[in-house]
């Protein structure tokens, strides 16, 4: 971050003249970009580049990696919307896209693409439009799947810009329109190559409207004449073109090559995999390579690489040949005479038939009539030396020709263009080292036609040197190594390869000859006939009559002699002006294709007889004769075909260069670099701006052409790998053949050894036969012995079967005996079990008899005690009244306590309701536990309500029981005797009630704490424990209004010694005293208790029931022992307060019972 603090200083150091400082600062910026993820540094670099146009900053921006790609695209999207920075940012986008970054697939989803399309739809600046169209054309092969979203936008842009080329808005300079037309032509090629069905459908729908018909006729239709019928138009569909699966297997250079394959333009089409042009085409133009450096136009064409050319209208083409425009250029070029054969062309039947695409001829041309294009020019097919259609090469040199046909050889060799570092060396073209660039350039400046002029050849070389200065030496070494490898792999012979239709057909010559004728005319015009062309014409005239059947003959007689008339010169000047801008199809050079190794010219009609049917050949011959007659009748009338926009642009640059050099040669200025206009003064501002814009457009066009050249070079490297693999496979096949021969020798040796083995086998066979006869005799003897042994074994087998049957019978008898023994053992065990059961029953009967005798004695003792007493009823009634009063008070207090408990229960209900509300609030946050918590809360509420209802029912039962007891005591007349006992019992009950109240509160508090500790689960103590804390409870529930009093539980030291005082003093006729145990889970009170504490689990209730049952059995046994020991004791007095034994006043019968019996009585 400390380095980013002084970004301004670092940016200023980027433009330092010291390479070390520049490299260090660049490294710092790259490291900062790798560590910094924010957009600040990228935005600063973009702003600085827009201000200074710094090349180091451009290098950093074009090598950005993820995630800074999003920041760069967003920043460029922001500046595209501003008119002031739109051109600069489009140039930056072009630089970034041409390097094909790793994140190029994100361009289809970035907002920059819609902004670019909107700019191309809305902007009116031609420079911006041309730059944007070239950037879009470069991007389309990288993001072909974007056509599914923006296809209509691409078509709208094409329709808008194509109409501009015709309507010519008033504020647009004519020179700009030439560049725009060339870029629109390139866009046409790209859209037609990638989306032919949709594009043709758009053209059909868009240009069927009346207002667009003129645009179609003048602009679009000439473009369509230079493309083939796309195969997708036959086999594909609109949806298939937009299917992303179509582009998955294609890389960027594959898409570019596929688009180039459908072009008929020789500078745009791709020649590979059999796309060869007949050597006759190269023989027709023997001076193309010789004159390649004498014209500024030719090198511009080479710098463009695969610059395509489309037809244009005649009116627009003739604009440049009118005397009012560029007169000096035309006059300077027209004053130089040209040989007649270089102005001629071929007649094309497509122009007459109205066909936009000439039909391709079948690829069945014999091998002796055509040669591979690459090998015909001395290059290797598929090797590093690229075909002429690729941008990586300049026009190839001419094939070997006779000495008189190579008149321009010495001059052309002296001024040959040195190959640039992008060019690929081949075996037939000498490789000039880089040190020869300066002398060659100086030699060019000495030529008459280029004296004092700045040729356009130096511009792409200079730009290429700036762009790739660092890796130039490595590329030179790589090219030399590849050239050496190619020379080792491939042979020098030109193997015959069947050419593909289209390039070998006669119609292809029409599209190719225009640019080549232009090249010859411009080259010869620039040289100014420095070499006498008469040997060439004499040779052409000499070879002319040798042709037996000429389908196309020249219209004008050969010219170029020194004694030509002035009228003839004027005619040649006029024809030259026409041929420069609009090459004529009605003229053809008299020379024909020269086959390699011979001077004979093969007849042209032989190609038609092979490539086309007889009817087509007859048709072409007939048309040729008609044209010849028409040309002889009116030789001045020439058919003017369309010229491609790229050719117009090239000729404009050529003529501008010629006019510039001519005007500078006329001016007598001391320094031509200072004052360079026609008038010798400073140029006007608008002219400077126009020239700068034109230079920028040319630079953008060169960058686009360099991109295409790089894609072709990448393709060529892939083809080189294929050639290497093919050579390796050939070597592998040769090795396999050698192995096959060795294996054949081995087979012969194995055959000889096989014969030897067969002879040996026959000997062994004879030996085997003798051995077999001996063995047969031994076998017969052994068979006889075997039969004897077999008879003996049969006898033994019968004896064995008899023994087995006897054993089976014995086993059956043994099983029967075992079954009888088992049955006897079972009966014995049953008898012994019955005996043990009878003994236990007998012991129980003896125990019960003893207990019956003891109980009878106890009963007699109690009867004697009752008979010996003399009760005083008056005193007893008073005491009973007092006791009942106290008991009434106690019941009232008990009722008060019950009310308090009811209030507590209500408060508990309120607490539970509040707890339920809290639970409901909690349930909103915990959706997973909604049902469980809701059921628990509702269960708690129901338990509290059921407890309350049960408590009320118990209270009512107790009141009824009290009233019933009062009624019984009054009937029996024992109220007076029981008053004293009641008073004492009331006091004891009050004490116990106090203790019970304290214990209840403690137990209730403990229960609440336990319930709160288990997340709302209510846990109750055992029913027995509840009774122990709450004191004794009187329970009654019989249908016959009979009541039973239960003994309350006490702490363990007093649990079995308590008594109920009022009942102990009853007479013998009263209800027997009941000593009760805790209720079980199936008794009446047990069910009530379970209703009070419903939230307790069933398993706990069952366990409690089992514990209470065992406890009741223990209580019965202990009380039985106590009753047995009471016979020898004197009963205590009534006033004795100790509750450990029954009172002496109690005369009733002692009854041991359980709550289970009460439950059965109620049921």
From Swiss-Prot:
Q: List where Pro residues composition bias occurs.
A: 393-402
One cellular component (GO) term of this entry: postsynaptic density
In terms of SUPFAM superfamilies, this protein maps to: ARM repeat
Q: Where is this region: Disordered?
A: 295-337, 353-594, 1008-1163
**UniProt entry keywords in alphabetical sequence:** Chaperone, Coiled coil, Cytoplasm, Isopeptide bond, Lysosome, Membrane, Phosphoprotein, Tumor suppressor, Ubl conjugation
- Modified sites of kind Phosphoserine: 487, 505, 511, 521, 595, 598, 1097
Signal peptide positions (record): none
- State the residue spans of region: Mediates interaction with WDR45B: 403-787
SS bonds (residue pairs): none
Q: What is the effect of changing residue 1027 to W?
A: In chemically induced renal carcinogenesis
Q: Which GO terms describe its biological process?
A: adaptive immune response; adult locomotory behavior; associative learning; cardiac muscle cell differentiation; cell population proliferation; cell projection organization; cell-matrix adhesion; cellular response to decreased oxygen levels
Query: Mind telling me where the Glycyl lysine isopeptide (Lys-Gly) (interchain with G-Cter in ubiquitin) cross-link is?
Result: 30
Q: In which tissues is it expressed?
A: Highly expressed in brain, spleen and kidney, followed by liver and heart.
Intracellular or extracellular location(s): Lysosome membrane; Cytoplasm, Cytosol
* Mode of membrane association: Peripheral membrane protein
Composition bias (Basic and acidic residues) maps to 474-487, 1008-1020, 1088-1099, 1154-1163
Q: Where is the composition biased (Polar residues)?
A: 295-316, 512-530, 1066-1083
| Annotated Low complexity bias | 321-337, 1029-1046, 1131-1146
PANTHER family, sorted:
HAMARTIN (PTHR15154:SF2)
Q: What is known of its domains?
A: The C-terminal putative coiled-coil domain is necessary for interaction with TSC2.
Return the protein name.
Answer: Hamartin
> Which species is this record about?
Rattus norvegicus
Give the source lineage, highest ranks first: Eukaryota, Metazoa, Chordata, Craniata, Vertebrata
